[in-house]
Amino acid sequence: MSKDFILAVDQGTTSSRAIIFDKKGNIRKIAQKEFTQIYPKSGWVEHDAMEIWGTQSGVMREALEFGRVKPDQIAAIGITNQRETVIVWDKETGDPVYNAIVWQCRRTSSICDEIKRDPQFVKYIKENTGLVVDAYFSGTKVKWILDNVEGAREKANAGKLLMGTIDTWLIWNLTRGKVHATDYSNASRTMLFNINSLEWDKKILDYLNIPESMLPEVKNSSEVFGVTDSHTLGGAEIPIAGVAGDQHAALFGHCCFEKGMAKNTYGTGCFALMNVGDKPVYSDEGLLTTIAWAENGKPTYALEGSVFIAGAVIQWIRDGLGLVRSAEDSEYYATKIDSTNGVYLVPAFVGLGTPYWDMYARGTIVGITRDTKREHIIRAALEAIAYQAKDVLECMKEDTGLDLAGLRVDGGAVQNNFLMQFQSDILQSEISKPKINEITGLGAVFLAGLAVGFWKDKQELKSILTTEKVFEPQKDSQAVAHDYRGWKKAVERSKAWAECYS
């Protein structure tokens, strides 16, 4: 039977998804199932690792059944996943010793504070992992499990426990324990992997007291990791041939293969990644250095910046203020006026991310006069999303010395044409919106397809990724500079507010 399809396994923070793609990049079927979010204490977030596997294997079978695709028609599987979330399990039984600790979980903040008391070690971590010391990353989460779960430390020291990010857990289960591996992109998010030597970092492992025997083998993002066990998917042994963290897979799905190419994902927040080539670039502007993907043992590096509040500001003006009935209405109101008339909205509801990193900043609306109307506030909210993206992308330009070679966009907010046009104006750069919405899944299947010869090269991938719309700058650079100065002044007003007035 001909192998006409590739299956994307897209394991996210709130749901497990499976997407079947054909050779032209068309979607045959999507299946999705949400799973339980566990909050044992304030600031703690967990997932049931067995529920993750159960929902993920379930949607894979569902996509095949309802897409009318037989398992032996699948040429390969590509995995993309929520990053940093980590699981520790028993090597013999395959049972987790504790729930998965999710990337959002802040329980290891005190461990991070302890590390930060040693500035030289903090510097070492940044220079060798590309990351800042934060509870966000996997390393301190593993330490917490070993220190707090009864018997875990002893078992780990005896070589009886394994750890892995979500991709590793899925590979382990898909192969029935035959393969314990991760890819370079996911490894680079653990705070345990040296992105220069491309090995697990012994100095950091020793500091956190994590036995190296627990760690998975690190493989290329585009490579056959192993095959599914014959009992997993209807008797078929399907190659698992592509693996990447979700934001990395999106960069690959956007075909950002050249240095200077960047993508921005507009979700609740924003994640911007720029391809910086075959050598790591370290940021002076608060960005993270990461491995985008690796092929044939050669990594491609990226800079990453995150904005905490993007699409969430539209939810706020809808649900909190009642200024619009639906998110789609925001575009209608924003286009009823020519400008915000000097009004700026800084959505620092939970502080500010890149490049400000101010946890005490708070939301601010400035420039209000007696003439300010609902439309001005709505438009200012949309413009704030674009200004924050510009903040991040300007940092990338500063760190790399590269001009932005256009911006590829995805996520829910890209359906707002006003926002995309304003983003193009404020960046003075072309914005490309692809026809396909499932860019993360597409990136995973692109990686898998290249590994098994389903597609021959990246040039063929570029022909599959078709553009729905291109936005070109329509404002002159002087007007843009004037507006951006106003944004910067507004941000200054929002800084340290909770610290000063709590």
Curated annotation (Swiss-Prot):
EC number: 2.7.1.30
Gene3D superfamilies: 3.30.420.40
Catalytic activity of the protein: glycerol + ATP = sn-glycerol 3-phosphate + ADP + H(+)
Binding-site residues, glycerol: R83, E84, Y136, D246, Q247
Pathway annotation: Polyol metabolism; glycerol degradation via glycerol kinase pathway; sn-glycerol 3-phosphate from glycerol: step 1/1
Gene Ontology cellular component terms for the protein in this record: cytosol
Highest classification ranks of the organism: Bacteria, Pseudomonadati, Pseudomonadota, Gammaproteobacteria, Thiotrichales
Reported regulation of activity: Inhibited by fructose 1,6-bisphosphate (FBP).
Pfam families: FGGY_C (PF02782), FGGY_N (PF00370)
Organism of provenance: Francisella tularensis subsp. mediasiatica (strain FSC147)
Protein's recorded name: Glycerol kinase
Keyword Heme in annotation: no
Signal peptide (UniProt feature, chain positions): none
Free-text function comment from the UniProt entry: Key enzyme in the regulation of glycerol uptake and metabolism. Catalyzes the phosphorylation of glycerol to yield sn-glycerol 3-phosphate.
